Amino acid sequence: MTTLDQFATDKLARLEAGALRRRLRPTARAPGAVLERDGQRLISFSCNDYLNLSTHPAVIDAAIDAARRHGAGAGASRLVTGDHPLYCALEARLAALKQTEDAVVFGSGFLANTGIIPALMAREDAIFVDELAHACIWAGARLSGAALHVFRHNDLAHLAELLAAHRQAARHAMVVTDGVFSMDGDLAPVGEMLALAKAHDAWLMTDDAHGIGVINEGRGSAHGHDVPLQMGTLSKAVGSYGGYLCASHVVCELIRNRARSFVYTTGLPPAVVGASIAALDLIATDPAMCAAPLAHARRFCAALGLPPAESPIVPLLLGTAERALAAQAVLEAAGFLVAAIRPPTVPEGTARLRFAFTACHAPDDIDRLAQLVHDRILVTA
């Protein structure tokens, strides 16, 4: 009989053999782009804190004040006694930024998607998902029990073909996509996708985890389109923690009643909620700050002759996990931290370096990084 420890050891050995084992590495962050790891100071291009708001004095002060006034924890599910007034203020800020009637806050983006999708979809329904959608979208879709149809990445013709073939057999239909794709940095064609969904009587849901705060003056990838379900996170450009859904009031009320990851979860800590409110206020009033990460990504792309970035995320595909790890080591030795992304996070054969640009990156550091990538990685590829 295999013991649990033996089972785990064998699994880890297989991951190690494929250069796919991951390890936690304690990392000390400070204001700005510099961090310390294993005694080395590194300029990080691997952080999703795109606006550096997690260390903004106003955001920190708001977190401290909320904790002092409301305590360290919510104390209960929001449907019991955990619905402090701060939550209503946060949801109002989100709805205002996204220009929707209402919003619902979740404990994380993963909890949001695994709660929203099963609350709206069931076995009699059909879900159409972009093949590169985030893992939590897949988790939510599978939990729902609905028929799952996968369309090629950003391929509207393939989506139309699948809708034509499968929509009529389903009670309800939902099209789900990332607004900004977290590993490729490209944007979904939201306007065209919305028109296609409406033509087939389907609901469109966008995951804007990497769009809020940095696309369309901070309003996100769905801005300007009447997308009925706009989901996202508070843990990236907002610099805090949590997930959300922006939608109509009646849809949000249904989610508050039916999303299991909302109903059966203690509310976010007041400090997190206070920090998120302060960050959203900064995003709403500083479009120049919101534009900086994309401008920095485009500066990097121009220096390397790459196509202009669509978001603060720039991938450099290297193929194998071994090559990606070797490239990461080259940059780390020179004082830059750029994460190697390997399967299963990305498809087999597409391991890459993922460059994430923030508002505080200095132009000189971006230029030095681009030169290093050119000389030590691209030239030797």
Curated annotation (Swiss-Prot):
- A molecular function (GO) term: 8-amino-7-oxononanoate synthase activity
Q: Tell me the InterPro entries matching this sequence.
A: Aminotrans_II_pyridoxalP_BS (IPR001917), Aminotransferase_I/II_large (IPR004839), AON_synthase_class-II (IPR050087), AONS_Archaea/Proteobacteria (IPR004723), PyrdxlP-dep_Trfase (IPR015424), PyrdxlP-dep_Trfase_major (IPR015421), PyrdxlP-dep_Trfase_small (IPR015422)
What biological processes does GO assign it? biotin biosynthetic process
Binding of substrate occurs at R22, H134, T345
- Biological function: Catalyzes the decarboxylative condensation of pimeloyl-[acyl-carrier protein] and L-alanine to produce 8-amino-7-oxononanoate (AON), [acyl-carrier protein], and carbon dioxide.
Is Glycosyltransferase one of the keywords UniProt gives this record?
no
Part of which pathway? Cofactor biosynthesis; biotin biosynthesis
**Family, per the entry?**
Belongs to the class-II pyridoxal-phosphate-dependent aminotransferase family. BioF subfamily.
Q: What is the name attached to this protein's record?
A: Putative 8-amino-7-oxononanoate synthase
Q: Note whether NAD occurs among the keywords.
A: no
